[in-house]
């Protein structure tokens, strides 16, 4: 049990709709992350999907959080959606190195979110494995059901890449997939309404049981951040997992 760590957070921290529920009304937005990091121990940064943060921004994030806080960074859409992993490994490495320079020990790893049109083939599997930088922890979230198979889990495990489980309003399994001995990753997007639906306490209790049975490090992120469902669910799961 001593090696077990659970990191819980949301896919972002700057949600204005949380003001009055999570953030105090008088709290300036520049202090949001510091306040957030006092309540939760991880955040998934989705803004990097659209633009690369400056070193100043990354350093500010690092200084605003405690020693045990972790950031998970989404890989840019130019890599995953526009070029569809038809990239050189150096492109990924350059981005990852830029992020690591600013976040240092606060960097948890990198999330590759792939589009629904990116289906399983042996060629695409190789693209995934060749796109990651093995110097970092890499997680892949697929959006097509063809990736949910044991061969994929096995190949990714051999390369040290984590398969992200997902709760999403699509015909995709919401099972918590554990394909790595040391790391578990799960994203909750809201069901039945994407980004909007709140998970019930009973659903979170089941998830907590799964997390607590895993002896490695778990990363759980709520992306149902339209309004307060995500932050509410994250705080509830934190209590259940303590």
Language-model features, listed with the residues they occupy:
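Residues lining hydrophobic/aromatic ligand-binding pockets adjacent to catalytic sites
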Residues: 1-242
């Amino acid at each position: 049990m001593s090696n077990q760590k659970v990191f819980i957070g949301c896919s972002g921290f700057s949600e204005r709709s949380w003001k009055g529920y999570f953030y105090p009304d008088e709290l300036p937005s520049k202090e949001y992350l510091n306040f957030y990091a006092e309540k939760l121990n991880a955040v998934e940064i989705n803004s990097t999907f659209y633009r690369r943060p400056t070193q100043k921004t990354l350093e500010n994030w690092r200084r605003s959080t405690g020693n045990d806080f972790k950031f998970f960074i989404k890989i840019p859409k130019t890599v995953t959606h526009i070029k569809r992993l038809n990239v050189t490994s150096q492109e990924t490495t350059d981005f990852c190195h830029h992020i690591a320079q600013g976040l240092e020990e606060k960097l948890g790893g990198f999330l590759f979110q792939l589009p629904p049109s990116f289906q399983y083939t042996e060629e695409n599997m190789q693209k995934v494995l060749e796109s990651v930088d093995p110097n970092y922890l890499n997680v892949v979230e697929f959006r097509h059901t063809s990736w949910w198979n044991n061969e994929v889990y096995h190949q990714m495990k051999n390369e040290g890449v984590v398969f992200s489980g997902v709760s999403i309003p699509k015909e995709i399994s919401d099972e918590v997939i554990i394909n790595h001995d040391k790391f578990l990753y799960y994203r909750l997007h809201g069901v039945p309404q994407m980004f909007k639906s709140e998970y019930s306490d009973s659903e979170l209790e089941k998830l907590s049981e799964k997390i607590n049975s895993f002896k490695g490090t778990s990363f759980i992120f709520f992306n149902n951040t339209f309004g307060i469902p995500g932050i509410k669910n994250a705080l509830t799961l934190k209590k259940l997992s303590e």
